[in-house]
Amino acid sequence: MAAMSRIIIAALLLSVTVQAQDARQALTAGDGPDPWFGTFSIIAFDPATNELGVGVQSRAFGAGAAVPYAKPGVGAVATQASANRQYGPKAIALLEQGLSPAEVVKRITDEDPGRDTRQVAVIDAKGRSAVYTGKRVIDRNHDPKDLVHLGGFAGFAAGPNFSAQGNTLASEDVVKAMAAAYQAGKGSMAERLMDALDAGQSEGGDTRGMQSAGILVVKPLPANSDSTVERIVDIRVDDHEEPFKELRRVLNMTLGVPNRLTERSAQLAKEGKFAEAIAEQKKALEINPRNEQAMYALAQRYAQAGDTKQALEQLGHAIRRQPKQWKPQAAADPIFAKLASLPEFKKLVLP
């Protein structure tokens, strides 16, 4: 199985361009006040939906707020390493003027005296991309006194409509795996970006570890639409021991996954498939563990399955969080009819 997976990934990478710098030392702090976002990211354009997106992870605080920039119908930017946060708005403005991503990257880096410590990636709404990695992002010759010694790789892997890039990475395999995962993805852009980040981490990710992550996806408003939402997904995890797991959870909430799981759980229960129904509802609660509606639905599933103890326990969780809502609802709910005579149930639902 492992050998077959490697073959599949290798095949996917045939259309990917890989460029890199590999060294034994990596800068972990930039010059002056610019924060260091030693990180990996992916920028992408989906011609089928006209969505533009950025996904990022870093062993630095708040990468999801600092690295990604995007404007619907124009382009997306990831600015990292010793991040120049002016790159984002400048690059977007230049794309709007008609410059190509390659021209944009050259313009903004030529104007920046600190460019040697920068890494920036730009993609436009035609799917063209360009990446710049400064020569001091990983530098064998810089004064060792100014460096924290880490194994590191800096570079990118680009293909049609996307580019994956990073620095202070475990190896070139990080960006290769991101590229393969994005190309193989079948879900929404946000899900494909998430899959790419997970794939990069599976190959070692940032050599320093994990702390923050984010996903930004934008889309032009349809003509004659009542919608005012151009940011389809705008989520981030600023400081977490498991940022990938937490970002996936938040993404699932954003995409309405818990609601779909609850609907499926209810349908399975109607079909008498109680074990499957309970399993689906547990998934919904894992994604949104503080949601009393999910707790109440799980109590319903247990009641339908005849598990009185678990039904009362989950119902108690929901009622304690929102007694005014769930007490009267549970008292009138036919799903709990068989529990109505129990003292424990009466204690939960009576005023």
Protein language model features and the residues they cover:
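Terminal, low-structured helical/coil segments at or just beyond the last alpha-helical repeat
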Residues: 324-351
